[in-house]
Structure formats: structure tokens, C-alpha cells
Amino acid sequence: RRGDLDDAFAGIRAAEDAGFQNLKLDTVLMGDLNDDEIEDFLSLTKEHPWEVRFIELMPMGPCAAWPKERFLPVTEILNRFPALEEIEPNGVARRYRLPGAMGTVGLITPMSHEFCGACRRIRVTADGKLKGCLHSREEISLRGLHGRELEDAILRGILQKPKGHHLTEHASDTPRTMNEIGG
């Protein structure tokens, strides 16, 4: 979306050199924009122990106005690459591996297979607000809170988690973009 891809890969390699493990590379799958690059992303798992994750395009932020043709279910990857073998899931990602590959492939399906009921995530925004749901307007400021007050605020955020999203009916309720939320 922004910046230089070579710089991004240099950062990933620097993280590896620093001893970070279980690196995940997320990419939003968009029909007629980057679906011709799926094989390139999959090939990264052949030589690196990374998890390359494909996320379905969600109607939030600037993407909410995009045409529906941009939406491509990530399960399309399974149709195009039948050699992918399913392995144990991890969080919200269904995981696969190419035969002989070092890394894995994750498919995250917020649109085609909603997983809200199993979501155990909360997020803290760059400006210090807790969000119980990626798509909710509800936020709790954590700035200046300590000890019991902080614990109570986090618990409130967890208890406010909705049972599901409404993305198939309308765009996300949050006015924030993913990079503001921490997604």
C-alpha cells in the first residue's frame, strides 16, 4: 500500500536476524488487484519459515467504497492451488502448507466464514484506546490508567465484545483504518 517492498523485506530479515520467530506476513486479497501475485506469496513459504496469511477484503475505511468485485474469498486460493495441505489451525487462521515448504499459509475469512464467536482478541490503538472488536465504534481510553483501573477498563472492553459483525449488511462501524487500529 505504501513504501518500498524491498525495505519491508529488509525489515523482515532484520527481525529474523534479531532472533524473532513465527513471523507472519499479512496480505489482503483483492480481486483484479493482487490476485495474480498469490503464487509469488506462496513461494515465499518454500524458502522461509514464515506464515504468509491472506485476509479477505473487509468493507472498512477507504475500502468500504470499493466495488464488490474486489472481494475474493480466500478459499479461492485452495481452488487455484490444490497442493496445499491443511495443518493445525492457529487463532483465526486456517493453516496450510505446500509439500516440502518451510513456512505455512494462513487463510483468514472474516467475510465468507465469520469467526466472531471464537474471537479472543482485543486491540489497543496507536493513541491508547482499547477496542473489543475491530469493527466497533466502541473504544475505551487506557491513557493514564494504572493498576486496578487499567484491569477494570480491559475487562469492560472484553465484556463489550459483540457476538458478530454486520459486514455483509453494511461497512464497518469504525471510522478508523487498519493501521490506526493495529490490525
PLM regions: where:
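Auxiliary Fe-S-binding modules of radical SAM enzymes
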Residues: 47, 57-183
